[in-house]
Amino acid sequence: MTNAAEIKVLSTQATEEAYRELVPQFEKATGHKVTTVFTGTLGAQKRLADGESYDMIIMAGPAIDAQIKAGKAVADSRVDIAKSGVAVGVPTGAPKPDISTTEALKKTLLAAKSIGYS
């Protein structure tokens, strides 16, 4: 394809599984080559702040909004492409925490010995 382009993408890791499935299909259909850097949100923000440039960035909505405000992304190019759920997991045999209300969730989090998140 004579009009094929190389498209540079910066993406946070939340979309990686679906992305790795879809990009080869896109490349085959269009002839374009997609080069992607996957990183966490803070890593992506640092790369952009350090002046790295990309044709497309894929991040959570608030992070994209921050890039728009910083002049690193064009406001009318923002498109929501996915919804993300949040889950709680506990070790096998541990009691299930009460997260049925905002107050119960707050109490559970404050009582936790440790919390891991990504």
Summary of predicted features, one role per range:
Residues 2-116:
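N-terminal segment of the mature folded domain
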